[in-house]
Structures are given as structure tokens and as C-alpha cells.
Amino acid sequence: MDSEKTGEAKITIQEPKAADPKGKGIADAPPPPVVVTTAKAIQKLPRGGWKKGVAIFDFVVRLCAIATGLAATGIMGTTEQTLPFFTQFFQFHAEYNDLPTFMFFVFANGIASGYLILSLPFSIVCIVRPLAIVPRLLLIIFDTVVMALTIAAASAAAAIVYLAHNGNSNANWNAICQQFNDFCQQTSTAVVASFITAAMLTFLIVLSAFALKRN
């Protein structure tokens, strides 16, 4: 019996009795009984059941990554501080676009957030069609590219934030966070949010690769 069939019925018809040896038939013999035997259906668990659960989890993680990516972009993009004192020639002002590294950070995390938003329809397709291979393969490829971009931007910004906090005596770079405390706190928060986004992208890559595994 095939396990994928919903059920089958077996009909058994008894053979009529043979005629009397003397040549006389049995006139009053009842019609042959019909015996119907029904086999119980054996339902097979859907192959894509666990993959659908993975796809739903993928969708939720993407929403969280969008939130952290937008937070990193917004916090860094609005980072600015002006000290309440100034001299005749200088005004002490710090803004994210004073450093090309922070500008690259905003650009990269903005791209990552935009990509994650555009990837949501593909994630929904994976929920509707959990056995589809092409959408998951595309997600793995683009997730990897965006993850690399996000890690590069976060790492570069983290190096600048470290110098802002600690300085570098060999290069005569003084720490500025004692004066620009709010500026340093905002940039540090943005870098942490960006690293969280990169970690979620890494997890999404592993999740998609696991979902491509065949039963």
C-alpha cells in the first residue's frame, strides 16, 4: 500500500457454488455476498512543515534587523554637538559628517536597511512556498553581500570611536570624549546597533542555508 494515498477500498465477491453433480442447479441459492474492506488512511507529514516554521522565523528576524539598521543610521546621522564655549577664532563643534568614516557608516547602514525592507517579499514567498529553492538562494547571496558591507562600516566606525575615547599618544591624537561626551555616546550607540544588525544578517544566512537542506 502506498503511504501517500488517502485510503483504498477492497471489494471481495465470493464465487457462486458449483452446480449439483446430478446436473440440477441450486435454484434457491442467494446472490453472492459483497464484502467491502476499507483500509485506514496513512497520512504522511508534509515535507515543508519545518521549513515553513524556519521561514516565519526568518521573517521575524528580518524585521528586527530592519529596526536596528534604521536605528544605527538615524542615530549616527543626527549626531552633533556644539560646546557652550568658543574663542575668537574657533567654535568647538562636532558632527558626524566631519569624518568620512561616519559618512560611510550612515551610507552603508542605510543601504542595509533598505535591502532588508526589499527582502521581505522574498521572505514571504518562502513562507507561502517553503520548498522553493530560488528565493532562499537569492536571500543567501544578497544577505552575504550586505552583511560584509555592514561589518566593514561598523568596524571602521568602531575604530574612530575608540580613538575618540582613548586617543593615540604615538600620533599625538587626543581623546575628545571628555569634551564631546554626547557626541561619543551617540556614535557608540550607533556602532553597537550596527554590529547587532550584522549579527542578525549572519544568523539569517545560516538560517537560509539550513532551510535549503533537503529532507
Swiss-Prot record:
Pfam families: CASP_dom (PF04535). Its main location: membrane. Keywords: Cell membrane, Cell wall biogenesis/degradation, Membrane, Transmembrane, Transmembrane helix. The keyword Transmembrane helix applies. The chain crosses the membrane at residues 56-76, 102-122, 137-157, 190-210. It comes from the Eukaryota. Belongs to the Casparian strip membrane proteins (CASP) family. PANTHER family: CASP-LIKE PROTEIN, CASP-LIKE PROTEIN 1U1. Homodimer and heterodimers. This is Casparian strip membrane protein 3. It comes from Ricinus communis.
